[in-house]
Amino acid sequence: VSNNGMLMSDTQTAYVLALQFNLLSDEHTEIAVNRLVDNIKNYGHLTTGFLGTPFLCHVLSDNGKHAEAIELLLRTKYPSWLYPVTKGATTIWERWNGIKPDGSFQYPSMNSFNHYAYGAIGEWMYSNLMGLKINNNFPGFKRYTIRPLFDKNFDNIDGSFNSNYGKIAISWSRKKGDLKLFLNIPANTKADVILDKNHPGNWAVSYTHLRAHETRG
């Protein structure tokens, strides 16, 4: 870390890894977050690869830059997650541009069209858009956190996870300025629900209990 708080390797991946693994002081963390955002804006896109991409949007959302993470998610120009979709992709590719803008292909020796790495964005979508977060003190989703980050680009988010205790289901919707959050909490589990501080207001709560024989397990 230099005297002005910047990393000696001034790349998106360097900042992402330093922030993800808490390698910086509080003062340097703020500088690193701002520098990461500036770097993304200067390039106009992400520049991370297999190491940095799985943590990029997590780092942005965890440090108050969720809007910037959403912007990366919804980008359709290369390099981005949705660029392959514009080329007809139904899987995650090994390269951001496995099919080039002119329709030609990259060299087949490194051009898998079913590759794991960039698919890590799915976990971020589960834990931030849907809002299901693991509590490391309670393995197996015995207790967990539900903290969806509502965003103006989405009117409906709906998802579920089949835990050992049953299905955890989360959905939220927006209509005429009102937000509605629906949860399904399996029996014998606990959920800590945290509402986005950027959407203050009054929340009306209603719930229904299911009898044990009505649940799976």
Regions inferred by a protein language model and the residue ranges of each:
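Active-site core of glycosidic bond-cleaving carbohydrate-active enzymes
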Residues: V1-F182, A187-K197
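Solvent-exposed beta-hairpin/edge-strand motifs
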Residues: D196-Y207
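Conserved small/polar residues in nucleotide/adenosyl-binding loops
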Residues: T208-G217
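Glycine-centered loop/turn positions within well-structured domains
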Residues: A191, G201, G217
